[in-house]
């Protein structure tokens, strides 16, 4: 799939060798969908907010991990910008995904949150702060909210396409039925690329290991999103999290 695999070293730098993000810059916004000042639309998957990161900041113990953002800023729009953070539970993977969404997403204003943290001292802090259309998918959440696990890929696709169409309706006619096709068409029509964040990437591989249909559908979804030449045209940055090493996902 082309993702870098994280070194299991305890070095701080090595702990963030695997982020995956897809960012989209919106051109046209549906008036009925505006939820924030300034005309920016905040959704569940496209243009996520910063609430989850705010909870982490308000916690009794908070460790500044914004050095990860220095790295992702550096590798954005390069072959190194496909990152998979594979680590055991409780290693802060979801925290990292929420931090990336809060920093990059156009759907929120996170200046005060990051002020005083390490990233705010870097030269390109302002350049990337809340400048992108981020797609943030939590696969565990989708699995918990679908009645039939065999429909999860269709459910993910339905939800993301619905939000993409609120902004890119002119670029996405009714016949567009997959996320990769939608992102490719948007890039071709507008020149905009995406930051994609996928949390709990491997939950279906672990929890539905005995269901071959789910496995096949999901692997094909991931291949369509990230494998080959076409995704490099519409992906600005990708950050994926999971427990299993990426090589075990059979992609």
Describe the residue ranges of each PLM region.
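Intrinsically disordered, low-complexity segments enriched in serine/proline and basic residues
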Residues: 3-21
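Phosphate-binding site recognition
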Residues: 15-17, 23-251
